[in-house]
């Protein structure tokens, strides 16, 4: 039996070898006393500096041969079968003894507690003992033990017992030990682990920038400007817009290739050299188109002035064919409604051979209307003239000295555009063309 107690004590020490340094020893339920006796005194008397001893729930019924522990302050004997024999605690010479826990034992009478009057007990716990059911139990116990302040963890007035100063000191010591251990584990070398290093801002030339989620203001504005330019150049309903406000569409199934902004003038001159009949439709401006036309208004005026200068210099076929005829305001949904009104009125106007003076006047009118309305133009290339040898680039500016018969022959040689093109004319264009037709008849009669 002694060996069993020795092994239980070794297990409770958890590897601690210095018996004199031990302050607390807990043997709750470690051994079941068959005869209800405590272990031999020699097993526990090795711990002379022991202050807290707990031997709860070991089945002890007698305190005979209780070890002599002069520094013992608190003894826990709860959940046992103790009835009498408390005098053995007095014989053990427990001079520092002040806290006794006898809860859930078999003490039945107040007289059995009389030996405890010789001890300097401050706290006594008899919870769940039969003696607690006696009448005037509390007052009688307080009257028996004069030094007693707390019975069953409450004072004589029923106030709960606060934690003792000793217990507070023990807890403070434990907290300090834990803090010291934490300081040893974290020496505070200033190192940053992976997560903190990833979140730390990068330093570059004295500037700190967040790696994720930061966008430069200039870069944001540049990206917005690029988006606006791309939207202006994006095709709408199968058509594409130039930067100068013109919208290009495919005519007769032919695709129109949009040149870069720098090559826009050269592209128009190529159209003139190939003798294509260019039909210009004035379209209604949307909000986005108005913005594009306003931004490029100055460029349009420069281009139109350059075209007028080319016409004054007498640039033959390219000058005559690059003139843009104002065909009136047109909407894509209204073309089918205007077919009957525009029949037979575009043949003479679209031949592209007119007097330079008339072209100059007509261009001035177009320029004035453009400035007033701020509307863009729809440029549609028409299928090329079949007979390049007959007309081609050989068409020269008509002078007043030329023979009228020769002028009529040149006009007869030019192919008349497809009648379907006349369907895209509009009422406004009809009025302008009537006036131009009357001026042409008067000029022919004078010649």
UniProtKB/Swiss-Prot annotation:
Top-rank taxon of the source lineage equals Eukaryota
- Where does this protein have compositionally biased stretches of type Polar residues? 232-242
Q: Where are the LRR repeats?
A: 49-70, 71-90, 96-117
Tell me which InterPro entries the record gives: AN32, Leu-rich_rpt, LRR_dom_sf
Task: Report the protein name in the record.
Answer: Acidic leucine-rich nuclear phosphoprotein 32-related protein
Question: What is a single Pfam family found in this protein's UniProt entry?
Answer: LRR_9
SUPFAM superfamilies hit by this protein: L domain-like
Lineage at the top is: Eukaryota, Viridiplantae, Streptophyta, Embryophyta, Tracheophyta
Family per UniProt?
Belongs to the ANP32 family.
Q: Name the residue ranges with Acidic residues bias.
A: 163-194, 215-231, 256-277, 284-309, 336-374, 397-415, 433-447
**LRRCT domain residues:** 129-167
Q: Where is this region: Disordered?
A: 155-447
Tell me the keywords, alphabetical order. Leucine-rich repeat, Repeat
